[in-house]
Amino acid sequence: KIRANFIAIFDNDAEGYSSKCSLLNEIKNWPANFRILLYPEITMFHKYPTIAPNGKIVPDDINKKAASIELYLPDSIIKTGGNYYPIEWESRKRIRNKNNVEEALYQGVISYKDDIKHKFHEMRNKIERGDEVFKTEEWKNMKKLLETIVFAFNNEQ
C-alpha cells in the first residue's frame, strides 16, 4: 500500500484525457491519497488558433484535445510574428468519459514543436547567463500547472 500522496497528471489533450478517463473507469474507488489530474484549463485555450481541414486558421477550444505542456510556456516562445503557433489536428479518438459516456475528440499537436523547443532552450540559456531577465508574469500558465500539482490535496477532487 502506498502511504505517500500520489499524483498522476496528464496533458490536457485527447490522449491525456483518454488516459485519465480509462483509469477512473477501471478503478472506481481511489484511495484518498491518490489524484488523477489533467493539466489545467487556461482561458486562452477556449479560442486557440487551429488549422482547419481547408487549411484556414480558425479558433477552437483545445481543452481535452491539444493542450500539451508546450502551450503553458510564455507567449514569446509559443508565438511567431505576433501569432500563436496553431494546432494541427491528427486523429479522432473515441473516449469513454468518467460517466462512461462515449465522446469523440480530435487529438491535436502544436505546430513547429522543434522551433518551440529551440526558443525555450534559448530563453533558458539567456536567463542563466544573465542576458535576459526572468519575468514571472510570462510564466503564469506554467505557474497554474504547477499549482495544480502542488495544491492537488488542498481541495477535494
Feature roles, as predicted:
Residues 1-2:
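Short, surface-exposed loop/strand segments
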Residues 86-157:
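Terminal low-complexity/disordered tails
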Residues 5-118:
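Activity-critical C-terminal alpha-helical subdomain
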